[in-house]
Amino acid sequence: MGRKKIQITRIMDERNRQVTFTKRKFGLMKKAYELSVLCDCEIALIIFNSSNKLFQYASTDMDKVLLKYTEYNEPHESRTNSDIVETLRKKGLNGCESPDADDYFEHSPLSEDRFSKLNEDSDFIFKRGPPGLPPQNFSMSVTVPVTSPNALSYTNPGSSLVSPSLAASSTLTDSSMLSPPQTTLHRNVSPGAPQRPPSTGNAGGMLSTTDLIVPNGAGSSPVGNGFVNSRASPNLIGATGANSLGKVMPTKSPPPPGGGNLGMNSRKPDLRVVIPPSSKGMMPPLNTQRISSSQATQPLATPVVSVTTPSLPPQGLVYSAMPTAYNTDYSLTSADLSALQGFNSPGMLSLGQVSAWQQHHLGQAALSSLVAGGQLSQGSNLSINTNQNINIKSEPISPPRDRMTPSGFQQQQQQQQQPPPPPPQPQPPQPQPRQEMGRSPVDSLSSSSSSYDGSDREDPRGDFHSPIVLGRPPNTEDRESPSVKRMRMDAWVT
């Protein structure tokens, strides 16, 4: 710290003057001591302060020094204040005192001002505190692939959809129904870069898009033509049904019991949901090959989906394509499609009956369990082999197709207002009735013959009203013509 120079004037402040006198007096005595030792001389200091107090310093005995002083006739050098000031002015110091060894102890008005300014600055710094962290505002577009061991949570069906992010996040944060062991955030997933959700088994992770930034079709957004693709986010479907027109359309189905999870109390914690977009987006993490579909360039082309959760309402899942390289432990033939009417309720497949039911009733669960059979476990390896030599839609024109649809709902969709016929085959025991369980997961398979069959059909059931899914409204000839079905099936499989 450099020594400061002060103006040599009388200090007006009494306290400051007293402090300065004490420190400078000691400094003067210290200088006299140094001079007496260094130069072998006798020094006597006599000081009277403003209150007439006497302070003295003598290098030896004061009386001896004073006696010598009185005997001395003419001093060799005698100086006063005016002489010192004149000498300093000649040296160019302009009346300012040279820095002393103890000048930093000086408490002049100028030093007091500086000390007060330093105190104010330090108080300002201390009160301001450390610089805060930047605010944690995560308003970003994210894609959250979640490998969920449990089923997809079914939020309150009567609640309205505030925002897609809110619905997806509320579904993901419900730890009682969904506990994701692996959660990966991908910021701003570009449509051009294919992504894969993480996988731990034969079925991949559930794809949950909070802001619907998911590759779809030819690289377009799921909201490509102004309509929300409800199939892109299973959380939105599970929360409010198919929000197919971008409006708030809460489902009228009663919420499933047991926290809204269909058959949750009796399921294994190994269920997986794979809902990737179409061929140019994400593919399931199974051993699947890319499907080049003719419908892949449409913004609302239905994706390649393997849904194994019962809480997805069917109106948002109208399937038009299946992957071609699933595990071929079981293959589905056209003769097995006639037995699908037995699988019409999620309560039919309890976990105690899954294994035996898969082995002995394979024809009943082959297509429906892969598409909407939420009760099937991960290791069941049910698959669909849609190679060119097998045509799924090669059943007869109308009657077996009626039997193929689940027990009453799909028949009513085709016949508009006709009462449903009784199911031709006995059903496995149901733990809960259909009215308590809400929509059956098989009802999500709207027709399997067209990717848009469920769009213009009227649901005459009183307990559920299906919202309209955006699609191409087919006419009656397109529904009933087997050639049209085969042409569509050939367009699916490549």
From Swiss-Prot:
Q: Point out the annotated site residues (description: Cleavage).
A: 174-175, 211-212, 453-454
Crosslinked residue numbers (Glycyl lysine isopeptide (Lys-Gly) (interchain with G-Cter in SUMO)) = 393
Q: Which residues carry this modification: N6-acetyllysine?
A: 247, 393
Q: Which residues carry this modification: Phosphoserine?
A: 59, 98, 108, 233, 253, 345, 398, 440
What are its GO cellular component terms?
nucleus
Extent of Low complexity compositional bias = 171-181, 440-453
Q: Where is this region: Required for interaction with MAPKs?
A: 264-281
Pfam families annotated for this entry?
HJURP_C, SRF-TF
Cite the record's Basic and acidic residues compositional bias ranges: 454-464, 475-494
Its main localization is: nucleus
List residues, modification Phosphothreonine.
Answer: 302, 309, 405
Record-level Gene Ontology MF annotations: chromatin binding; DNA-binding transcription factor activity, RNA polymerase II-specific; DNA-binding transcription factor binding; histone acetyltransferase binding; histone deacetylase binding; protein dimerization activity; RNA polymerase II cis-regulatory region sequence-specific DNA binding; RNA polymerase II transcription regulatory region sequence-specific DNA binding
InterPro entries on file? HJURP_C, MEF2-like_N, TF_MADSbox, TF_MADSbox_sf
Give the region (Disordered) as residue ranges.
Answer: 171-218, 238-268, 380-494
Which residue stretches does the UniProt record annotate as biased composition, category Polar residues? 380-392
Biological process GO terms, please? Answer: apoptotic process; cardiac conduction; cellular response to calcium ion; dendrite morphogenesis; ERK5 cascade; MAPK cascade; mitochondrial genome maintenance; mitochondrion distribution
SUPFAM superfamilies the UniProt entry points to: SRF-like (SSF55455)
* Annotated DNA-binding residue span(s): 58-86
Domain MADS-box as annotated: residue spans: 3-57
Tagged with keyword Acetylation: yes
Which proteins does it associate with, and in what oligomeric form? Binds DNA as a homo- or heterodimer. Dimerizes with MEF2D. Interacts with HDAC7. Interacts with PIAS1; the interaction enhances sumoylation. Interacts with HDAC4, HDAC9 and SLC2A4RG. Interacts (via the N-terminal) with MAPK7; the interaction results in the phosphorylation and transcriptional activity of MEF2A.
Name of the protein this chain belongs to = Myocyte-specific enhancer factor 2A
Organism field:
Pongo abelii
What are the leading ranks of the lineage?
Eukaryota, Metazoa, Chordata, Craniata, Vertebrata
